[in-house]
Curated annotation (Swiss-Prot):
Substrate binds at N74, H80, D87, I101, S102, R111. Keywords: Amino-acid biosynthesis, Aromatic amino acid biosynthesis, Lyase. Pathway: Metabolic intermediate biosynthesis; chorismate biosynthesis; chorismate from D-erythrose 4-phosphate and phosphoenolpyruvate: step 3/7. Its EC number is 4.2.1.10. InterPro entries: DHquinase_II, DHquinase_II_CS, DHquinase_II_sf. NCBIfam families: aroQ, PRK05395.1-2, PRK05395.1-3, PRK05395.1-4. The gene is aroQ. Catalyzes a trans-dehydration via an enolate intermediate. This is 3-dehydroquinate dehydratase.
Length: 146
């Protein structure tokens, strides 16, 4: 069975209470449970990780290469300035799909640039929690060689 990793970055543990007008009322626990269920229907095992700390995210990305076949990553605000996370993604051979709940290109100007997207297999933004499922579908296609 394929194993995939879902990584959520800073402040995503506050889903459901933080800026519900932007991120919705769903919680991280709900998102993770829904994603695990969706992955299971595809015959895939999905493990979830969340951290507010850049180093912890870098560590899990490094470790992932030997354990998982791909990563779905929401780097949160690190998207816009973490060259260290960008370098961690670039240093591994498994595909990474970047996902964002909101459309970062329609928000404040400082959110428009993603320093991590260029080293990811793709980026999905603006579809709420459904974007994570789209990322899962895209990652599975990437792993099939599509």
């Amino acid at each position: 069975m394929k194993k995939l990793l879902l990584v959520n970055g800073p402040n995503l543990n506050r889903l459901g209470v933080r800026e519900v007008n932007v991120y919705g009322k769903g919680t991280l626990a709900t998102l993770e449970a829904d994603m695990k269920q969706e992955a299971e229907t595809m015959g895939v095992e999905l493990e979830c990780f969340q951290s507010n700390h850049e180093g912890a995210i870098i560590d899990i990305i490094h470790e992932a290469e030997d354990i998982y076949e791909g990563i779905i990553l929401n780097p949160g605000a690190f998207t816009h300035y973490s060259y260290a996370i960008r370098d961690a993604i670039a240093s591994i051979s498994i595909p990474v799909i970047e996902v964002h709940i909101s459309n970062i290109h329609q928000r404040e100007s400082f959110r428009h640039e993603s320093v991590t997207a260029a080293v990811c297999a793709g980026q999905i933004v603006g579809f709420g929690f459904y974007g994570y499922k789209l990322a899962l579908f895209a990652l599975m296609e990437k792993l099939r060689g599509a």
